[in-house]
Design a protein with these regions (language model features):
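Helix-to-loop junctions at the C-terminal end of transmembrane segments
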Residues: 71-82, 271-284, 372
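Cytoplasmic helix-loop-helix junction between adjacent transmembrane helices
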Residues: 113-150
Length: 409
């Protein structure tokens, strides 16, 4: 097989094809979905494998821990190892992990398998900077936005798709189907992706150490990571607590109806290509302001109507769409800004950015559960409102030099 080789040192002059963008976006969505398939099935899986109610939470927790560790220790390899080979190997690891989860006879091997599913799912965070490498500066935001739209659709659709599939096949069948999809995806990526050999010649240990240096000495990375951590915290809080709220006495929705609610929220993924185009035109500052304000307002509108009414349900659907739109917008703007800082350490920058993003989401989920248990939706929603407001306060302290850097980047 012959393959194209992307010169890591040479700026790209021609943008990648629409077909390649679609492939990368689809790959991101399919791989990211692996992180979420188990969430609506956790109760059934725990019961079959003999896990207690408390221990069942480990299914989601270990997947998230694996993903977080992968962001810190695997994603930076994109600056060191030939990218196509790294992406395909990571997707191949996902195949093995999903099969192991499907065939696990009891809890211990299953939990080990979902931990590996989490680690291997970081392939998405290799694909996004890979797309940026293949794209000239002038259209990088648009391309990254389109690829990120696939990621967000995968995240939003994974839970309802898993719930629907489980009506026809067992939870083991869901994992096996995903493994089959990953096999096909790995073969397609190997066949169609160009090779890209990074310039970095650092030892792996030095590569990891350099991430700390980048985190300490890159103001744009610090700010964009902080904004997105708060935004993803609000996003995770919303999607942790709304299923509880909708299934509770105010609305009494079934699991199928809640899945439809989640599908409506996926409409917010259309923000990704729009945000990318705004960043390419130098509108990052204004678009970020819009995203932070929109996220805060999304929580406020849920208090306009009385609980349990048709209007209040419609406002929750609207809040889901606008919140997802805002979070996706801010994510794409952040990645566009940090990818402009330097091609030679793009994967490390993305690893730091996404690890911070992920920690914000984990904290938001934990705080959301606590707030809902303490004060139902009222407490959870006001906490969700506070997160983007805090990010907005920090954002408004940006100096002129930082605004100029964002506009030029």
């Amino acid at each position: 097989m012959t393959s194209t080789v992307v010169d890591a040192a040479k700026p790209q002059e021609e943008t990648i094809s629409s077909a390649m963008i679609f492939l990368l976006a689809s790959a991101c969505g399919l791989v990211a979905a692996n992180l979420y398939y188990a969430q609506p099935l956790a109760g059934v899986i725990g019961a079959e494998l003999g896990l207690s109610s408390a221990a069942t939470g480990l299914i989601v927790t270990l997947t998230q821990i694996g993903y977080g560790l992968g962001l810190l220790f695997v994603v930076p390899l994109g600056d060191l190892v030939e990218n196509r080979r790294l992406i395909v190997a990571t997707v191949g690891t996902a195949v093995l992990a999903l099969i192991a989860a499907a065939l696990a006879p009891h809890a211990a091997p299953f939990l080990a398998a979902v931990f590996l599913v989490g680690i291997s799912s970081v392939a998405v965070q290799m694909i996004v900077p890979f797309a940026a490498h293949m794209t000239p500066h002038a259209t990088r935001g648009r391309v990254v936005g389109n690829v990120m739209s696939g990621l967000m659709v995968g995240i939003m659709l994974a839970r309802p798709v898993s719930s629907v599939l489980s009506e026809f096949v067992s939870w083991r069948g869901v994992f096996l189907l995903s493994a089959a999809v990953m096999v096909v995806l790995a073969l397609v990526l190997y066949r169609l992706l160009p090779q890209r050999v990074p310039d970095a010649k650092l030892p792996y240990r030095s590569l990891l150490a350099s991430m700390g240096h980048l985190a300490r000495n890159t103001p744009i990375l610090q700010r964009r990571s902080a904004y997105q951590a708060a935004m993803f915290g609000a996003f995770s809080l919303f999607w942790t607590t709304t299923p509880l709220y909708l299934s509770g006495p105010a609305f009494r929705l079934t699991q199928g109806e809640i899945a439809l609610f989640a599908l409506a929220g996926a409409a917010g993924a259309i923000a990704a290509p729009i945000a990318g185009r705004m960043a390419d035109r130098g509108w990052t500052w204004g678009a970020t302001l819009f995203a932070l304000v929109t996220a805060a307002v999304s929580f406020l509108i849920t208090h306009i109507a009385s609980e349990g009414t048709h209007l209040s349900l419609a406002l929750l659907v609207l809040a889901a769409i606008t919140l997802d739109f805002a979070v996706t917008t801010n994510l794409v703007l952040g990645q566009r800004a940090i990818f402009a800082l330097g091609a030679e350490y793009r994967s490390r920058l993305n690893g730091v950015f996404m690890a911070t993003f992920f920690m914000g989401g984990a904290l938001g989920s934990a705080l959301g559960g606590w707030a809902y248990a303490s004060g139902q939706w009222a407490a959870a929603s006001w906490l969700g409102f506070a997160l983007p407001v805090m990010a907005l306060g920090f954002f408004l302290t940006e100096g002129r030099s930082e605004k100029r850097a964002l506009k030029l980047g």
